[in-house]
């Protein structure tokens, strides 16, 4: 089981779709060696060094957290049903209402659209909010994603810089 890493007062909570088998086996988020999450958040400026999956709790030192839409691990996120994503979106709203981070970053357009019953999402900041929490849709850093490392870092850096501008 991959536990959430959440606390009050966070700048951002990154929300993956669901744990892969590597994460489920180790208990650490974004644990597959091909997953670029840790590299991307470092290069985008969220952390001052590249953390390892087993150091995930240290995200809190940087006022960052992680969660997921669906708890069930799969080989590929495409194995998660629309119903699971929709139910996960409802649970996620409750979590975010409790913790009220500055931003929630959903990692994937389809995950956002199905989890929040939205259509035609674009990358970046969304008009939908959860209380005072901004919702952002960022490309998924999975090794299965075709998005280049450069584009991932650019998208995540936009969020980091927006939070800096807000004084967070």
From Swiss-Prot:
Keywords: Cytoplasm, DNA damage, DNA excision, DNA repair, DNA-binding, Hydrolase. The keyword DNA repair applies. Transmembrane segments: none annotated. Its EC number is 3.2.2.28. It is found in: Cytoplasm. The keyword Protein biosynthesis does not apply. GO terms for biological process: base-excision repair, AP site formation. It catalyses: Specifically hydrolyzes mismatched double-stranded DNA and polynucleotides, releasing free uracil. It comes from the Bacteria. GO terms for cellular component: cytoplasm. It holds the Pfam family UDG. InterPro entries: MUG/TDG (IPR015637), MUG_bact (IPR023502), Uracil-DNA_glycosylase-like (IPR005122), Uracil-DNA_glycosylase-like_sf (IPR036895). One of its GO terms (molecular function) is pyrimidine-specific mismatch base pair DNA N-glycosylase activity. Belongs to the uracil-DNA glycosylase (UDG) superfamily. TDG/mug family. Excises ethenocytosine and uracil, which can arise by alkylation or deamination of cytosine, respectively, from the corresponding mispairs with guanine in ds-DNA. It is capable of hydrolyzing the carbon-nitrogen bond between the sugar-phosphate backbone of the DNA and the mispaired base. The complementary strand guanine functions in substrate recognition. Required for DNA damage lesion repair in stationary-phase cells. Binds DNA as a monomer. This is G/U mismatch-specific DNA glycosylase.
